[in-house]
Each structure stands twice: as C-alpha cells, then as structure tokens.
Amino acid sequence: MAIAVGQAAPEFALKDQSMKEVKLSDFKGKKNVVLVFYPLDWSPVCTNEHACFVNDMKQFETLDAEVLGVSVDSAWSHKAYAEKMGIKYPLLADFQPRGAMAEKYGVFLADKGITGRAIAIVNKAGNIAWFKQYDIPVVPDLKEVASALAQVKAASA
C-alpha cells in the first residue's frame, strides 16, 4: 500500500553513487526532499526522466529542494549511470535488501523485482507533502512536480 499525504515519511539510510550514506533525517528542518522512484538505470524512459531533472535542476534548487533518485540498482551502477548522464544529484541504491526502501513507500513491484515509478515530496518537517505514482512507461510531468513543490515551500514559509 502506498504512503499517504500527511504521514511521516519512512526513514532510510542508503548509499549513493559516491558510496556516501544518505539519510532522510539529514534534510529534516533544512530542505524539502523530492524522492524520484524509478525502475532501473539505463532504461530509455528512466534516462528521459533523469535528463528532464538534470535540465530543470536550477528550478528545484530555487524551490529549496534536494532531489534524490531511488532504484534497486547498485551504487556502482548508479556511479556509471550518473557519470554518463551528467547527474549531479544523489542516486540511492535500494539494492540490499532489494527494494526495502521502496517497499516502505509502497512502490516496490515485487513481481518484477523493481521500483515502480513515483515521486514523493517530503517537507522540512519530515512528512509526505505530495505523492504520485506513474505507469512505468510514463515520464512524470516536472511542471506538475515543481508546482506541488512551490506549494510545499509556500506552506512552510
């Protein structure tokens, strides 16, 4: 079952592509967090999605947000993928146990062994402020995400 707006966001501690541990609590009280759940590195739709985030990163930074990508790929896969794609934001490895974080957020597709496509915005208080799941072949509308993030930022001002 997917998470609900208003509930506390489940904590996590995962390695990024630099092998650095990233915890949700690192951002509490400091930044809003945009969790970008995606199925797999290197797939065409995921590559398009990340290209959109890379191109729009300034907008997300001005909205006081940290973008974190999350998939079941290893940190090593994330490292190669981020270098090839020019991704500067953290890509978190929900690798072992496979999909454990995605499971907490209700977006792990156990029958496929991958993370579903979804975006969650966690506000500075650590609560789910916005959440949307997408069909696997759909690239999320980043204007919609940015609009939701602007509302979250305004609500915390």
Language model features: what each stretch is:
Residues 1-157:
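Chalcogenol-based redox active-site neighborhoods
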